[in-house]
Each structure stands twice: as C-alpha cells, then as structure tokens.
Amino acid sequence: RLPPLRLHDCAAGSRRQVTAALASRETDIGVKKALHFALLEDFDHLYRYSDLLDMECGTKAEHLLGGYTEIMPGRPTISEHRFPHDDIRYPIDASASLLTKLNVNIITAAEQQTMNYYMNQQAFYKTALGRKLYQEIAMIEEQHVSQYESLQDPNATWLEMLLLHEYTECYLYYSCYLDETDLAIRQMWEQFLMMEIGHLHKAAQLLEKYENKHYSQVIPDARFPEPLHLGSNIEYVRGVLGTVNVTAKHEHYTAVADLPPSADFFRYQNSVNPDAAIVPSHLVIEGYLKAFGEG
C-alpha cells in the first residue's frame, strides 16, 4: 500500500493528465481557457508536493508518474489565492456540444474529489509542513471547484443534470475499459459500466415520468463521442505555460501586471498571505533548496 503522499502524487499526476486531455480536445473557448487556467495551478501544486515527497520520504515523483507528466513550476501557488467572485465564469447552455458538457462534468467531479481529499486528509499528515501545504492548496482546489461548477448550465433541471451525470459516468468507464490492458481491471471497468448503464436507464425513466421529456431532448445522439484517452501531456502543457502571469478578474482573465493596486486580487492577497516568508508552498521549496541545493 502506498503511503499517503506517494498515493497523492500518483493521483495528482493523473488528474493533470485528465485536465490536459480535456483541454486539448475542447472547442468551447470559455471552457478551454478555464481548463488552461487551472491546469497551470495544478502543475505548480504537483511540483511542490513532489519536492515535499522527495524531502520527507526520499521518493522521486517522476518514478510514480511514468514519464507522462513533467514536474515543473506552474503559476506560483502563492499567487493563486483570489477574491471569491474572481473564480466565477460564464456558463455553457443547452446548445453546447455533448463533448463540452462531458468535459465540464468530468473536470468538476475531479476537482471536487481533490478538494475533499485535501480537506479531509490534511489534518492526518505526519509533519506540520505537509499539513500546512495541504491546507493551503485545499483553498485553491475549492476555488477550482467554484470555477468549474460555474461553467455548468444553470438552466438545466435537476433530472436533466442527473441524466448527464449518469451518462458521464458511463462514458468514463467505457473509456477506461477500452484503454485497459490488465484483464482483471478491464473486467472491473466492464462491471462498473454495466452498473452505470442501469443507472442511466433509471435517470431516463425519471426524466420522462416527472418532466415529460425523452432522453434525446437532453442527449440527442446517444452514441459516445471519441473516448477519453490519456497519454503524454508534456508538449501540450509547455504550450500553455506562457499564461503563468495571468490571473482572473470577475469572469475574465488578465495579466497581474495590468491590475491596479486597488484590485480585489491584491486586497485578498494581503489578507490571506500578508507575509510571503511563512506561506507553506514557499517554505517547501525553501526547505528543498537547503536540503538538496536545487528545486
């Protein structure tokens, strides 16, 4: 069984793969920008967790990630703390493509799980520095959840959302089933897919019973789009790195250098991080430099 931080780094690398894969195929400009924006923040989190893992456990995160994801700084974690209303984006609507709806559902669920893990597990980590790093980044993950949930269609009914939720789960298990090479795990994906298809049928029945809508009014083409495939994201992420100096202002993105001194971003930063010298994400890198002479 992997220790918590090693398990976390494996999961963190996988989620960054998912985000990059979703962004690379997304056609909605607003959704694509949101994915790119949070992707660079998550890469910086991985960078800092990886240094903590090496410093405290003697494990190189690169060995856990299989070479698919490059461990490097992204948008500095300290600069990711934003005033709450700067994490809300313009939503999609019913006219969005099925692939866009799937992408929004997938990334919202992934970020929600990450936030829950950080918030629930941080208190049990073995060192004070690790607990503080979890706590700091949990705040950022909560912001990411707000961003991605705000992309959802606010006019969709609960049963329409239930149908899309079950459809999304079917799509993910189907994608895992197609890519899996381990027979035992492939059979598990197949079993879960069959279960979720049953849930999908039930959601369609509820939609028809209580809202008089056929599932095709929500999902016009019941066939899955191209399955989600995970692979190397190194070159793709390098192409996004040019936006590390961007932050959010209301529903839009802007360079930090273009913000006036009175901007909510700076007021919030001064409140949350009044002294950069005590910010956990900074302390991890400082400790790593002292121990190994490189970040």
Question: Predicted segment positions?
Answer:
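Non-heme di-metal
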Residues: R1-G295
